[in-house]
């Protein structure tokens, strides 16, 4: 919405995708540049084997899941079901999950309710400070479908299960 409001008053508009050009209302001064990807994402992708070894993954599949820095209730609920299933069925995975700021207590309650716990196969944190490294190591990512997350997933070529947010402007996920 902010971009749409400011577009008429700026010299140049940068758009992430071609579909945004007309919506921004200033096609004559809009350039499609795609979404930026942090250089660290590309750099760490080259260190995949070393990062996996550091994590102690061995031959296990690494699943990385997160719902954003604040946390997404539905992502935490779905991931809790998956973690319970993984542990019940002794699946050979290393699951790394970030609950987000408002998901810590919820996830702890879900652990008790569903009968699973962090340990050798499950690492739960509030926030991920080393996302480029974990994206490099992961085999599968479960997350919201934010534009920058999608750009980073594409940059490192990771398979993903994307959970759209119901709370975005103009249904952009």
Task: Name each model feature, range by range.
Residues 143, 159-170:
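Short hydrophobic beta-strand element within catalytic cores of glycosyltransferases
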Residues 18, 68, 100, 146, ...:
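Short glycine-/small-residue-rich Rossmann-like dinucleotide-binding loops
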Residues 136-138, 154-161:
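Conserved donor-binding/catalytic loop of nucleotide-activated donor transferases
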Residues 20-23, 41-42, 102-108, 170:
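Short, charged/polar "capping" segments at the starts of alpha-helices
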Residues 47, 53, 57-140:
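Donor-nucleotide binding loops and adjacent catalytic segments primarily
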Residues 1-46:
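Active-site-proximal region of nucleotide-activated glycan assembly enzymes
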Residues 1-2, 129-133, 149:
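Short acidic active-site motifs
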Residues 32-33, 125, 163:
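Hydrophobic residues at beta-strand termini and immediately following loops
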